[in-house]
């Protein structure tokens, strides 16, 4: 999920 990706980037 995109949300997961964004979380990782954070």
Curated annotation (Swiss-Prot):
Its EC number is 3.1.1.4. It comes from the Eukaryota. GO terms for cellular component: extracellular region. One of its GO terms (molecular function) is metal ion binding. It catalyses: a 1,2-diacyl-sn-glycero-3-phosphocholine + H2O = a 1-acyl-sn-glycero-3-phosphocholine + a fatty acid + H(+). It is found in: Secreted. Binds 1 Ca(2+) ion. Expressed by the venom gland. Keywords: Antibiotic, Antimicrobial, Calcium, Cytolysis, Hemolysis, Hemostasis impairing toxin, Hydrolase, Metal-binding, Platelet aggregation inhibiting toxin, Secreted, Toxin. GO terms for biological process: defense response to bacterium; killing of cells of another organism. The keyword Secreted applies. Its cofactor is Ca(2+). Belongs to the phospholipase A2 family. Group II subfamily. Snake venom phospholipase A2 (PLA2) that has antibacterial activity against S.aureus ATCC 25923 and ATCC 29213, acts by inducing bacterial membrane breakage. Displays a potent inhibitory effect on collagen-induced human platelet aggregation and has indirect hemolytic activity. Does not show cytotoxicity to murine skeletal muscle myoblasts. PLA2 catalyzes the calcium-dependent hydrolysis of the 2-acyl groups in 3-sn-phosphoglycerides. The determined pI of this protein is: 4.6. This is Acidic phospholipase A2 PnPLA2. The lineage of its organism: Eukaryota, Metazoa, Chordata, Craniata, Vertebrata.
